[in-house]
């Protein structure tokens, strides 16, 4: 579960290392975001000469959470960290060209096929 002020790892090669959630998108008063939800983030740490810089405000999709996701068969998939992939504000496509670490099949339902195709492992 991701809420405001949660620090997330950035799981792409856009140049950002860490991002902080500043708003959970999708309805007024919505408090938590899970895997596949779109959030608004502020970049907290970035590498030099990157596509994004510290202080940028962007949209991102949550790809991994410590809370995990429950499947219909009763299994739960949990991760060691909270991670997101930065999105372009205009067309909701990823800014980076590579995705680091595994992602879940639930992103396919949310119309993020580009992230699924770039990911090295889909659980």
UniProtKB/Swiss-Prot annotation:
Q: Which UniProt keywords apply?
A: Ribonucleoprotein, Ribosomal protein, RNA-binding, rRNA-binding
**Which residue ranges does UniProt annotate as crossing the membrane?**
none
Per the UniProt entry, what is one GO biological process?
A: translation
Give the matching SMART domains. Ribosomal_L14
SUPFAM superfamilies named among the record's database cross-references: Ribosomal protein L14
Which branch of life, at top level? Bacteria
Q: Which GO terms describe its cellular component?
A: cytosolic large ribosomal subunit
Q: Name one GO molecular function term.
A: large ribosomal subunit rRNA binding
**Pfam families, alphabetized:** Ribosomal_L14
* Function statement: Binds to 23S rRNA. Forms part of two intersubunit bridges in the 70S ribosome.
The record's comment on protein family reads: Belongs to the universal ribosomal protein uL14 family.
Q: How does it assemble?
A: Part of the 50S ribosomal subunit. Forms a cluster with proteins L3 and L19. In the 70S ribosome, L14 and L19 interact and together make contacts with the 16S rRNA in bridges B5 and B8.
Instruction: Spell out the protein name for this chain.
Output: Large ribosomal subunit protein uL14
Which source organism does the UniProt entry give? Blochmanniella pennsylvanica (strain BPEN)
């Amino acid at each position: 579960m991701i809420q405001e002020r949660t620090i997330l790892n950035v799981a792409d090669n856009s140049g950002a290392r860490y991002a902080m959630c500043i708003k959970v998108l999708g309805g007024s008063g919505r408090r938590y975001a899970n895997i596949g939800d779109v959030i608004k983030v502020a970049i907290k740490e970035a590498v030099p000469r990157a596509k994004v810089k510290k202080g940028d405000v962007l949209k991102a999709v949550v790809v991994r959470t410590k809370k995990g996701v429950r499947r219909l068969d009763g299994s739960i998939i949990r991760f060691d960290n909270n991670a997101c992939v930065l999105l372009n504000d205009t067309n909701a496509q990823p800014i980076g060209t590579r995705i680091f670490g595994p992602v879940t099949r639930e992103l396919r339902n949310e119309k993020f096929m580009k992230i699924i195709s770039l990911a090295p492992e889909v659980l």
